[in-house]
Each structure stands twice: as C-alpha cells, then as structure tokens.
Design a protein with these regions (language model features):
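FNR-like FAD-binding dehydrogenase module
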Residues: 1-184
Length: 184
C-alpha cells in the first residue's frame, strides 16, 4: 500500500512554507503544507511524515569531479549523478569510505585512512568530514564509482511529526518544523 513504508512511498505535492516565528527570534519555526489528496492516506496528529530529500546538485557535481568520473557513469542501473542525488548520504563520511580509501592508497595516506576507518581521529578533523571533505583530504585517490557508491550509507528519510488533522483539513498535511543550524 503506497505511503506506508520507505520501499513504497506516496507522492505528496509541496504547497507552502511560511515562517511562524518573527525574523530575528531565537527560534526559527516553519509551518509547511503538503497536498496529499492523490495519496489516499489517513493520518492523525502526531503520526510521522517522512520526507526523502535530495542532495545538493552542486555538491554532487563536485564529488563527481573529485572522482574524475562522468555524471553519466552507470551505477546500479542509474547514472552516478542520480545515485548521488537521491540514493546515498553525503554527510558524514562513513568509516567504510575510509576503509575503501585505505585499499586504494599507500604509505602515510593509507595509515591515516585506516585510522579514520577504525574511528580514530589522527588530524582532529573527523567530526567535520563529509564525503566531499574526505575526498579532498585524500585528493589523489580516485576509487571506482561503483565501489565508491557501495562505501556510502543509504540516504535516510527525514521524519517529522504531523501537526494537522485529516478530519479538519482533508488532503492537506501540515508540519511544524524548527530549523536547526550548526556553525562548525
């Protein structure tokens, strides 16, 4: 049944987003609405609504350039660009990526990649390494695109608590979302 699992999602049409809090407030809260008329879903306040977000195209293209690959390279029946946009997480860099890097490099770089793969932080920057930063850190390394994709984690949906009632606004789902920003 569509919309009941990550393997069979329902499509929702984005309707609107408006800021609930005043600009400059300590908190940044948004009211977001989706049209679910075509999805045929029932829900109650407090149910979860999962959103599969796409990765940033600019970031994806930078990663493809670092790999020295073409965006049209075939991976798992899709283009490399499609897989990087929609199927894998680009942050943080997983231990399996550093393990892959350790297999295709040598010397000090191999030791550093092995340390990162085992959870150590030889340069004190592991907390800041997303996939692009990891490739930049090991800039001479160009793993094969298929192996690279296999080393990444699947993109997870972002789950939000529904703040509207299907009975009050049939076909229209509302979320109340607090923006969280980190400065590293």
């Amino acid at each position: 049944e569509p919309g009941r699992s990550r393997d069979n999602p329902a499509k929702a049409l984005f309707l609107s987003r408006r800021q609930v809090t005043k600009p400059g407030s300590e908190k940044e809260t948004w009211h977001i609405e989706f049209n679910l008329e075509q999805a045929g879903l029932d829900y109650v306040v407090g149910d979860s609504f999962g959103v599969f977000a796409a990765n940033d195209l600019g970031l994806v293209d930078q990663i493809i350039a670092m790999l020295g690959a073409s965006h049209t390279t075939a991976v798992n029946g899709k283009t490399l660009r499609e897989v990087l946009l929609n199927d894998v997480s680009l942050s943080p860099a997983p231990d399996t990526l550093f393990e892959l890097i350790s297999f295709v490099t040598g010397g000090a770089q191999r030791e550093k990649a092995r340390a990162l793969a085992s959870g150590d932080d030889p340069d004190g920057d592991a907390a800041n390494l997303d996939v692009l930063a990891a490739l930049q850190k090991f800039s001479g390394v160009r793993p094969h695109p298929e192996a690279f994709i296999e080393a990444l984690e699947p993109l997870q949906p972002r789950l939000y608590s529904i703040s509207s009632s299907h009975n009050a606004t049939p076909g229209k789902l509302s979320l109340t979302v607090d923006a969280v920003r980190y400065v590293i």
